[in-house]
Design a protein with these regions (language model features):
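Stable alpha-helical elements in mature extracytoplasmic
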Residues: 38-45, 62-70, 86, 110, ...
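Hydrophobic membrane-insertion alpha-helices, especially the h-region
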Residues: 8-23
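Polar, glycine-rich mid-to-C-terminal structural blocks
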Residues: 297, 309, 316, 320-381
């Protein structure tokens, strides 16, 4: 099957298709009579409202209200009418370069919500977080905006400023941000490095046109350095181009194996994508890390490798974005975007979560503890992989080893809640401190230690910047502060890969994956080790 190139924009897939007329001709005569009867009743209601409603309404306004109500009642946030300028924006999104702040967004509960700030972008540096609801852009409320409207407002010329306010869980007041737009270029694989024990680490943060080539080069580089297995980290990957998701999975699957299927009411929407080449890294053990920010194309890759027993999936349940949208042309250069199909993994699991069920967003700094997938609270349908292993359905990709977030200490939570009230003021002060520290410490090395003296100096820098924090809370949250400082000083000096490598040193999910890979020689031995690991963590029956 040939899958046309598509882009998630943001986190929605647009498979461009030409619509055809003759809708009435495709229906039976009886249905046509009912349609005309309903149309006459609709026109009668509209005319009487236009003539008699206490507040004057123009017919065009009433038609628009009816159209919006019809689409709203479908219960599908991705089905909508796009005017010509919206369609032009959608085409712009396929070009891969634009002036913006670098965040992936979706519409949830009537508000534009941050799914993921992209690494190295103004949005990430400003401190935007997954789960933030953008409630204002340049003084305009975003209530009931669709994603296309939000994209048009958030994007703009390089160097221009956008002012936003976000609502964040645990913070009483909206948080203001003032962010300077930059030209956004997304590097698909920002981090590739060797860990101890001949284990490689690769992080992929998007599925762009270069994703497959970047990942192939990264795996080849790691193997040349002696890697006997690798971690593929998709935890911060909100998706991207569908065809790149298919080709990334193709790197590790055998020719002819199913990657993903689409199923809809119309026959042409029922398609199957298969691997076109042989496994390019046969026998190479692979652990895929996923989480609530892993979406769409990232879920296709994780699901395909899991179903074919090619990779062990570790982490938390993914976002669950698995629907296909098709564009149909309307009059006056308008377009109808319709959800026409859903994605299914090779064993038949639907990737799409039911609307209204949101993936939980972990609190920054939470540490996971492993639990077997069977211990998840709600019951989910079971499926069998190619070798007979049990995997769970119900929307999203459920890992083979599920991690549950541990909590920050109460003082750390209180400190973070206080910081969030200051919006980007904290991140601005942190960046200034990092720049100043690097200027006065020219011989610094990547493995530097953050000392208590540095933490004390940072506290005074916050006070001078107008970020008022309680000193006692600050001292009791010093573990978090020191990790945060270490990450951002590293980021400022050596870039994303060095910062990610430092963060991974304290990441229990990465440590868990690496420990499993060190004992594995083949994908099959990796599954055996994981099963033993899960059995040790399972609760024992009570006598």
């Amino acid at each position: 099957m040939k899958i046309k190139r598509a882009i998630i924009a943001p986190v929605v897939v647009a498979l461009l298709a030409m619509g055809t007329g003759g809708w009435f001709l495709q229906r039976g005569v009886g249905q046509e009579r009912n349609i005309y009867a309903n149309a006459r009743m609709f026109e009668d209601v509209l005319r009487r409202l236009s003539d008699n409603f206490v507040d004057a309404k123009q017919p065009a306004e009433l038609y628009q209200m009816a159209l919006e109500g019809m689409l709203e009642n479908l219960g599908d946030p991705h089905t909508s009418v796009m005017v010509a300028r919206d369609y032009d924006r959608l085409r712009l999104q396929t070009q891969g370069e634009y002036g913006g702040i670098g965040i992936q967004i979706d519409r949830k509960h009537g508000w534009i919500t941050v799914i993921s700030p992209l690494p190295g972008t103004p949005g990430m540096r400003a401190g935007l977080q997954a789960g933030d609801q953008i409630i204002e852009v340049n003084g305009e409320t975003t209530k009931d905006w669709d994603t296309d409207m939000a994209v048009s407002k958030l994007r703009g010329p390089k160097g221009s400023v956008v002012r936003i306010k976000v609502a964040r869980g645990g913070v009483d007041q909206p948080i203001p941000f003032e962010i300077t737009r930059e030209e956004i270029h997304i590097q698909a694989v920002p981090s590739t490095y060797m860990m101890d024990g001949n284990v490689g680490y690769v992080e992929m943060v998007t599925f762009s046109e270069s994703s497959t080539d970047e990942l192939r080069r990264s795996i080849e580089q790691l193997r040349a350095q002696g890697a006997r297995g690798a971690i593929l980290d998709l935890r911060r990957n909100p998706g991207g181009l569908l065809d790149q998701g298919v080709s990334v999975a193709d790197l590790f699957l055998s020719r002819g194996q199913t990657v993903v299927e689409t199923k809809g009411r119309v026959a042409e929407q029922n398609q199957r994508a298969v691997a076109r080449t042989a496994d390019q890294f046969p026998g190479f053990p692979l652990v895929v890390l996923v989480g609530p920010q892993s979406a769409s194309a990232a879920e296709i890759v994780a699901g395909a490798l899991q179903d074919h027993d090619r990779a062990l999936v570790v982490g938390r349940t993914t976002y669950g974005k698995g629907s296909v949208q098709t564009l149909y042309p309307l009059q006056a250069d308008n377009w109808l975007k319709v959800t026409t199909a859903r994605w299914y993994t090779p064993v038949g699991r639907s990737i799409q979560k039911p609307y209204g069920i949101d993936a939980p967003h972990p609190v920054e700094g939470d540490a996971p503890a492993a639990e077997p997938a069977a211990l998840e609270q709600e019951e989910k349908p079971e499926y069998r992989t190619a070798s007979g292993r049990t995997v769970l359905g119900g929307g999203g990709i459920h890992p083979d080893l599920v991690t549950t977030p541990d909590t920050l200490t109460q003082p750390e939570r209180e400190f973070l809640q206080d910081l969030q009230k200051h919006g980007s003021a904290y991140t601005d002060a942190r960046l200034s401190f990092a720049v100043s520290y690097l200027r006065t410490t020219p011989g610094i090395q990547p493995g530097f230690a953050v000392t208590t003296a540095m933490a004390d100096a940072f506290y005074h820098a916050l006070v001078q910047a107008g970020v008022s924090v309680d000193r006692d809370k600050y001292d009791r949250a010093q573990r978090w502060v020191m990790r945060d400082l270490g990450y951002y000083i590293t980021y400022s000096k050596w870039g994303e890969q060095a910062a990610q490598q430092r963060a991974n040193a304290d990441d229990p999910e990465v440590h868990m994956a690496a420990a499993l890979l060190r004992g594995a020689t083949t994908p099959q031995s990796l599954f055996t080790l994981a099963a033993r690991f899960a059995a040790r963590r399972a609760p024992q029956p009570q006598p």
